[in-house]
From Swiss-Prot:
CDD domains: S14_ClpP_2. Keywords: Cytoplasm, Hydrolase, Protease, Serine protease. It comes from Clostridium tetani (strain Massachusetts / E88). The gene is clpP. GO terms for molecular function: ATP-dependent peptidase activity; ATPase binding; serine-type endopeptidase activity. This is ATP-dependent Clp protease proteolytic subunit. InterPro entries: ClpP, ClpP/crotonase-like_dom_sf, ClpP/TepA, ClpP_His_AS, ClpP_Ser_AS. It is an enzyme of class 3 (hydrolase).
Amino acid sequence: MSLVPVVVEQTNRGERSYDIYSRLLKDRIIMLSDQVNDVTASLIVAQLLFLEAEDPDKDIFLYINSPGGSITSGMAIYDTMQYIKPDVSTICIGMAASMGAFLLAAGAKGKRFALPNSEIMIHQPLGGFQGQATDIGIHADRILKIKQNLNSILSEKTGQPLEVIQRDTERDNFMDANQAKDYGLIDEVMVKKK
């Protein structure tokens, strides 16, 4: 039994059925509604590239309801968002935590939104290592570089000084939509679609 709804449309050739995500893609809407991992990142990157090829001048809308996930997978999405020509508008529905919040903030300036009851959470990268001391040291250095890079990007995207980002991501930092707007993670709390 499929849990993905199907939409039936009338065309001049009869009826055509789509899964709901394919139908939304026709309207340039991409959904990130799961953990950020290699599979979700590949799907989102492919959709971003497809929509750019379809029309490089029309905005793309990325709806986010995600607890976060893999940094490398998230950075693949982030880099693609910055690389493609169309503006990517981000909209938080529900929760954007960790890498989900990072991607929310990475939307085109002026086009980053959250619905009124959304929750946004930022924090530092998580990592757990085991093995030889030398290997643990290598991984610790790597995660510190990643933390520095993520904080630097968040500082640029939010307009917050780097020191503020470093302090505020030291622990889980939860915000409602209005607090996220004041912080610079989003540009507007959207009550009704314009």
